Amino acid sequence: MTIPNSIPITPELVASHGLKPEEYDRILQLIGREPTFTELGIFSAMWNEHCSYKSSKRWLRTLPTTGARVIQGPGENAGVVDIDDGDCVVFKMESHNHPSYIEPYQGAATGVGGILRDVFTMGARPIAAMNALRFGAPDHPKTRHLVSGVVAGVGGYGNAFGVPTVGGEVEFDERYNGNILVNAFAAGLAKSDAIFLSEAKGVGLPVVYLGAKTGRDGVGGATMASAEFDESIEEKRPTVQVGDPFTEKCLLEACLELMKTGAVIAIQDMGAAGLTCSAVEMGAKGDLGIELDLDTVPVREENMTAYEMMLSESQERMLMVLEPSKEEVAKAIFVKWGLDFAIVGKTTDDLRFRILHQGEEVANLPIKDLGDQAPEYDRPWRESDKRGPLPANLVDEPADYRAAILSLVGSANQSSRRWVYEQYDTLIQGNSLQLPGGDAGVVRVENHPTKALAFSSDVTPRYVEADPFEGGKQAVAECWRNITATGAEPLAATDNLNFGNPEKPEIMGQLVEAIKGIGEACRALDFPIVSGNVSLYNETNGVAILPTPTIAGVGLLPDWSRMAKIGGAQDGDHVLLIGTDGTHLGSSIYLRDLLGRTDGPAPEVDLHAERRNGDFIRSAIRNGQVTACHDISSGGLGIALAEMAMASAKGLTIDLSESRGPAHALLFGEDQARYVVTVPADLANFICANAEGAGVPFRRLGKVGGDALVIDGVCTIAVEELRNTHESWFPNFMDGKAETLAAAQ
């Protein structure tokens, strides 16, 4: 269907483009006339939440974004952090939530493709990927179909492109029944003096289109990603993009080759809102206008209109400002890789965004008002209600501790994710040192004998719902802790803030308070936010998701031969708890999964204790004093011990007699800033003395050996039984076995 440019602009048409009446009035005021249909589409794309961050920008500015190692913070395609020796790591996390619910395979695949492009647009070769996935209740009729499609899409794209998936999360909760979350992370390596930015420079320079041809897929995708869902959701399927990882691999190689020639003045990938967003961002950042001639855009469908070409989200495309003298060199590279190379416009000095099509000017708009001066809102918000304390003595103990531990390790949310990550290529490129299933993924830095990078992605949405401020702090602290548990120094983070409708003050309040908590934790832990993404309107029929501010972080290991793993325990090692005894059962999985309760406050995050305990752990690991390390998070000490026993295939004999408090709080309390370590017997006294000297709380828990987890006076479980229970839930669920669904309920 061909859409003419002269469609009358009605209030219904404006509303269907996601623009509020007052926003349309502002457009009329800005341009002094009624917009053309193409112009309406451009405003709709650039002024939606997905591109403008209009509800969150005010609060995002409060986050710490600088640090001794930060080369490039937010505002570019990805963040850039120095890792010494002239190397840097380039990384970002981004959501592809709405498309993945509508079309799970392509939605997830193009989410991976988009984040990889963000990284190599900066001049970095991708070396690692992660994904944080949230699905509805296991017994919801759509959940299994969505899990299957999303996991296949993530694997299908990442594996074919050739990047290892080294970590991530998969969780289930009924609050995601109508809106799943697909948060994709990628990191790449570059030289610190060879980073490419998107800010256009110079007047009259060619604007070049690179990559795959433009089709009608994804038209209006950014607008869809900024709206709530309702019953008409199936009609939105055409707004999901289609990805081709082989084309993207060629685009990566062509771009990196091109970047060595000096031809690139500025470069931007085409993601949300396609050609519109990339051209506007490049021009607005450089205080330049952009003129495009759509007759020169490579297309793969006939009779495409200006509206469709400007808003198509076809994948594997880039836009760049070219050094004119290098045109032939640049073109030859793209022809060699079988990709399109077309000069589609030029930079101008008039700050206008002009679009020509078939000899007609179809758009002429002020570029700054579309880009960095788009509307910004200070939406009303209110603080979340505070939950009262929930002392452990008011929470029932399990009748059978053995059954309780087995039930948790074999539950929907605590069971092994092997079924998922075995569909991902975790070893491609040959540098993976730690694979999914531990605290953090670790990848060796190519061409360096000892250096490696650690990656983790974390958030506990039930904590954020209970207390957005503490939950925001906890997401940062757990990510920092997981990186620390390998022995790496946490360098910086990227955030992916997934929330409901910001026009509701209680939802806006969750976002504001979570950002405040994230900011406080990042400052206390020297863990700046260097890139990120906000996904709002994750609601269906007025029901919002759990607030989910995902934090993904990167850490540096100067010598990977000294790193710690969750499964390194040796017979005869001593088991130590670093941190305080467990006390906190509010908002815990023990409470939720065994007692069916979701009450109680989130655990408090003492950032001073996090820093002190984490620095102590890292130092002990780097000094070669630790054989295995695991942070304590969901499920508390009991689940951490079970996971260590399974990972090392060794028994643990644990004595809680020195610990203070009821056994269910000691074993299932989710107090923060805690680790379990195993240490050689001859170093145990030395490490305990060091902890005492550093003011770090610790407990001697027991020893490694045998083939069972023995918690003295509480329970005994064979490691083999733990592992069978842990490994069976996911495959049984995906096979549709009824007892798995019953257990999940």
Curated annotation (Swiss-Prot):
Keywords: ATP-binding, Cytoplasm, Ligase, Magnesium, Metal-binding, Nucleotide-binding, Purine biosynthesis. The active site is at H50, H96. It holds the Pfam family AIRS_C. Pathway: Purine metabolism; IMP biosynthesis via de novo pathway; 5-amino-1-(5-phospho-D-ribosyl)imidazole from N(2)-formyl-N(1)-(5-phospho-D-ribosyl)glycinamide: step 1/2. Its main location: cytoplasm. It is found in: Cytoplasm. One of its GO terms (cellular component) is cytoplasm. Transmembrane segments: none annotated. It is an enzyme of class 6 (ligase). The keyword Coiled coil does not apply. It catalyses: N(2)-formyl-N(1)-(5-phospho-beta-D-ribosyl)glycinamide + L-glutamine + ATP + H2O = 2-formamido-N(1)-(5-O-phospho-beta-D-ribosyl)acetamidine + L-glutamate + ADP + phosphate + H(+). Mg(2+) 2 binds at D118, D269. InterPro entries: PRibForGlyAmidine_synth_PurL (IPR010074), PurL_linker (IPR041609), PurM-like_C_dom (IPR010918), PurM-like_C_sf (IPR036676), PurM-like_N (IPR016188), PurM-like_N_sf (IPR036921). Substrate binds at S95, H96, N97, H98, R117, Q241, E313, S314, Q315, S535. Mg(2+) 1 binds at E94, N533. One of its GO terms (biological process) is 'de novo' IMP biosynthetic process. Its EC number is 6.3.5.3. One of its GO terms (molecular function) is ATP binding. Part of the phosphoribosylformylglycinamidine synthase complex involved in the purines biosynthetic pathway. Catalyzes the ATP-dependent conversion of formylglycinamide ribonucleotide (FGAR) and glutamine to yield formylglycinamidine ribonucleotide (FGAM) and glutamate. The FGAM synthase complex is composed of three subunits. PurQ produces an ammonia molecule by converting glutamine to glutamate. PurL transfers the ammonia molecule to FGAR to form FGAM in an ATP-dependent manner. Belongs to the FGAMS family. Monomer. Part of the FGAM synthase complex composed of 1 PurL, 1 PurQ and 2 PurS subunits. This is Phosphoribosylformylglycinamidine synthase subunit PurL. The lineage of its organism: Bacteria, Pseudomonadati, Pseudomonadota, Alphaproteobacteria, Hyphomicrobiales. The gene is purL.
